[in-house]
UniProtKB/Swiss-Prot annotation:
Modified-residue entries (N6-(pyridoxal phosphate)lysine), positions: K249
HAMAP family membership: DapL_aminotrans_1 (MF_01642)
EC number(s) stated in the UniProt entry for this protein: 2.6.1.83
Full protein name: LL-diaminopimelate aminotransferase
Keywords from the UniProt entry: Aminotransferase, Pyridoxal phosphate, Transferase
Similarity comment text for this entry: Belongs to the class-I pyridoxal-phosphate-dependent aminotransferase family. LL-diaminopimelate aminotransferase subfamily.
Pathway involvement of the protein, from the record: Amino-acid biosynthesis; L-lysine biosynthesis via DAP pathway; LL-2,6-diaminopimelate from (S)-tetrahydrodipicolinate (aminotransferase route): step 1/1
Binding site residues for substrate: Y15, G42, K109, Y132, N187, N292, R388
Catalysed reaction equations from the record: (2S,6S)-2,6-diaminopimelate + 2-oxoglutarate = (S)-2,3,4,5-tetrahydrodipicolinate + L-glutamate + H2O + H(+)
UniProt binding sites for pyridoxal 5'-phosphate: Y72, S108, K109, Y132, N187, Y218, S246, F247, S248, R257, N292
Length: 408
């Protein structure tokens, strides 16, 4: 009989969102007439920008002709999309990123997991707490952790608390780590990092020869012009950071699938024999072996994000969701709940009422208001006593959800 990867058996029972789905399905079975409003999983609801749809329709027409047909594309992405990303996402913000340092993919969730393919087994790893569960679970799956403790934390990982007491700012550790996961604007707390805070992280990484894995999937939601959108806005970050970005939330590509990862060519790691090796070449080799690229049609749609029409339409989408976030913040604050985030990110991070833990508040809102959110404890032990609501829904449903919650 074939042997399995035993590391999967160390995973806690049920990934957060499948557990939410299980509870919601049980409720819906028992209450088939209930009109549920889902503000849990961060999936967008508004249609794709028209510029992207038009570009994909043209690409489909191209593909129907002999001259315009495209088969396998470059595993790294088509040059015209990489050039547009470099110009508009990085060079426009004075970041020294070249098109060759950009790898187009089908999702930053995939990339933030798959990056472990090129990193060693013995790195000391730090994550923030609360944390996007994929960072932790992907390390568990490849055997980089020990067992789960009663607290929900895994042996072999170090956790940096982010809570109201420290202003949801991950404090720079005093001990050595090789690999650090950062996500700003943060999922799930909605907190942000200033340039000064990122400068301290880059300084730490350079002093410790550490690598920062920087998830900037929500950078487009930043409203404060003083806040950085990329870690590469910080001097020295090219030498110590990989950045993940996505078209999922800013342009609504959750079902269309397109993202990209940036690996500067100067970024180095060490081999088991202590030789310096550039990470760009390793990732390029990995992608060439395990990835066939994003479809031509989808990449044309992503390219259109950077057209004048696309930029205007994406800006309208961002404004729509951030207006939803403001409604959530103001309505919940009006009934005395403490609400964090929701100002530079599409997530509101709510302190649960006294006497309720995260899952109790989840069940309370599900039963009493028929509103689905995300329990903070599902993001780590420091998320206990908090609850996440997403701004990704229609205006009518957000208003109705707030009416229900403020009425119970």
């Amino acid at each position: 009989m074939v042997q399995i990867n035993g590391s999967y058996l160390k995973l806690k029972a049920g990934y957060l969102f499948p557990e939410i789905s299980r509870r919601v399905n049980d409720f819906s079975t028992a209450n088939p007439k209930a009109d549920l409003i889902r503000l849990g999983i961060g999936d967008v609801t508004e249609p794709l920008p028209k510029a992207c749809c038009n570009a994909m329709q043209l690409a489909i027409e191209e593909m129907s002709t002999e001259a315009g047909f495209h088969g396998y594309g470059p595993e790294q992405g088509y040059s015209w999309l990489r050039e547009a990303i470099a110009k508009f996402a990085y060079q426009a913000r004075n970041c020294e990123i070249t098109p060759e340092e950009i790898f187009v993919s089908d999702g930053s969730k995939c990339d933030s997991s798959n990056i472990l393919d090129i990193l060693g087994d013995n790195n000391r790893i730090a994550v923030t707490d609360p944390v996007y569960p994929v960072y932790v679970d992907s390390n568990v799956m490849v055997g980089r952790t020990g067992l789960a403790e009663k607290s929900g934390r895994y042996q072999g990982l170090s956790y940096i608390p982010m809570n109201a007491e420290n202003g949801f700012e991950a404090e720079i550790p005093s001990e050595h780590f090789d690999l650090i996961y950062l996500c700003f604007p943060n999922n799930p707390t909605g907190s942000v990092a200033t340039k000064e805070q990122l400068m301290r992280w880059v300084e730490y990484a350079k002093n410790h020869d550490a690598l920062i894995l920087f998830d900037a999937a929500y950078e487009a939601f930043i409203q404060d012009p003083e806040l950085p959108h990329s870690i590469y806005e910080i001097d020295g970050a090219r030498d110590c950071a990989i950045e993940f970005r996505s078209f999922s939330k800013n342009a609504g590509f959750t079902g269309t699938r397109c993202a990209f990862t940036v690996i500067p060519k100067c970024l180095r790691g060490r081999s088991p024999s202590n030789d310096e090796v550039d990470l760009w070449s390793l990732w390029n080799r990995r992608q060439s072996t395990k990835f066939n690229g994003v479809s031509y049609i989808v990449q044309r749609g992503a390219e259109a994000v950077y057209s004048p029409e696309g930029q205007s339409q994406v800006s309208d989408l961002i404004s729509f969701y951030m207006d939803n976030a403001q409604i959530i913040r103001s309505q919940l604050s009006s009934i005395g709940l403490q609400v964090y985030g929701g100002q530079n990110a599409p997530y509101a991070w709510i302190k649960t009422p006294e006497g309720m833990d995260s899952w109790a508040f989840f069940d309370y809102l599900l039963q009493k208001a028929n509103v689905v959110g995300t329990p903070g404890s599902g993001f780590g032990s420091s998320g206990e006593g908090y609850f996440r609501l997403s701004a990704f829904n229609s205006r009518n449903k957000v208003n109705e959800a707030m009416r229900r919650i403020t009425s119970i």
